[in-house]
């Protein structure tokens, strides 16, 4: 999910245009799979580039923080660290309570949308991922 487009449907920011700007490239919108464009990067820098970062922190957000952000119309970014190394970014766009569990609505550019328990998301997302960083967004 594009956070920039969430806040402004007329935003010109796309994943490839952010990559071009952040990495000093000009061709990522033509062929984003090149080694010059397909690079690990920092979500805080990308969200700062688009003007959508409020703050970020190492670790997870509490359900109270998630509720507060979603009720305010502000999705959260989450970094997933894989047990084998590397990372991945997803967006949290909703929540719901189902006693005794809390569920969150996650948008993932690879795995799509999912409704997942907060406990599972925190420690075993897609079996081998754990939530390592939280990114608070703004319009």
Each model region followed by its residue ranges:
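Active-site nucleophile-adjacent alpha helix/oxyanion-hole segment immediately C-terminal to the catalytic cysteine
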Residues: 1-26
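Conserved active-site-adjacent core of cysteine acyl-enzyme catalytic domains
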Residues: 17-139
């Amino acid at each position: 999910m594009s956070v920039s487009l969430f806040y402004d449907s007329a935003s010109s920011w796309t994943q490839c245009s952010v990559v071009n700007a952040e990495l000093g490239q000009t061709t990522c919108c033509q062929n984003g799979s090149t080694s010059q464009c397909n690079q690990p990067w920092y979500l805080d820098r990308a969200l700062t580039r688009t003007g959508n970062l409020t703050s970020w922190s190492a670790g997870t957000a509490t359900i109270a923080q998630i509720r507060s952000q979603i009720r305010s119309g502000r999705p959260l970014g989450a970094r997933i660290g894989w047990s084998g190394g590397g990372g991945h970014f997803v967006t949290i766009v909703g929540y719901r309570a189902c006693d005794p569990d809390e569920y969150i609505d996650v948008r993932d550019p690879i795995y799509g949308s999912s409704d997942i328990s907060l406990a599972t998301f925190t420690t075993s997302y897609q079996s081998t991922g754990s939530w390592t960083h939280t990114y608070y967004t703004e319009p």
